[in-house]
Each structure stands twice: as structure tokens, then as C-alpha cells.
């Protein structure tokens, strides 16, 4: 959480968190209380609660607005954000995904059912095409489980697994 200090502060400012209904009700006034807790339960995907999860929800919503809204000021609730600011907001989502889905032992277990299915599809005798649709978290765990090397995404505010990203496998015979 300490590495997200600037991102948290920016999100708090853009959301005007201190004047929000959530703060006025005593629910949350800042993301920097460092109360993030991982929840690991047998048979369930990893989960968390606390600051990082709350900030991730805000980050995710802002990123969707960034991509969907033609007016950048409107997407940022009237704030004039730079590309660097948007990258700081997106960093929260990247870290959240890393914490929950890309640690090697977690990634292998979370991605295992999907990897087994993908293997079966790739080995299906008469299969010409398979389309699977998932989430950025699916891609993050599959990439980590397959030990995909680090990559960079130039001109993208998200540095790890962008919303709407695709992972393509092609079988040559």
C-alpha cells in the first residue's frame, strides 16, 4: 500500500472523498489507512477487503470512464488530469491484480482450470476455432502461470493487463 501513496492521494482528490457521503457516514475518508487484508479460503478465488479493494473499485470505474468518455474532463469528474495522473489511477488496478492473481503459487492454482480447458481445446482433433471470454484477472493469472515474460504497453495508462485486452493462442499443424 505504501507504494500507492500518490495514487491514493490522487483518487481521494478526484473523488473529493473527504466531502463524500461515504466519509460523512464514517465509512471511508481516505485510502491510506493501510487496512488491506487478503482473504484466502479453500475452494474460492483470492479476495481482499480494505483500502486497496476500495481504491481498486474507484480506479476500475475511472479507467472505464477514461476509455468510454470522449470528454476527458467529464471522465475525471471535472478534473484536468494528465496522462501521468491517469497512469497513477491505473496503477491501483495493476497492483490489485498483481496482489490477488499473479503471485506464482496463486496464479498456477487460479489459472489451472482455465489452462486445462485451453489445453483440451488445443488438442481437440477437429477444433478449428475456440473463443473464450474472461476478465483482465484471468489474463493476469494465465500469463503469470505460463511465466510470460515482462512486457511494456506504450501509450497505455494501464501497464499490466488493460481492460479489454486479449490473449491469443494459435495452433499450427
Show where each model-derived region lies.
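Signature for phosphate-centric chemistry
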Residues: 1-130, 134-173
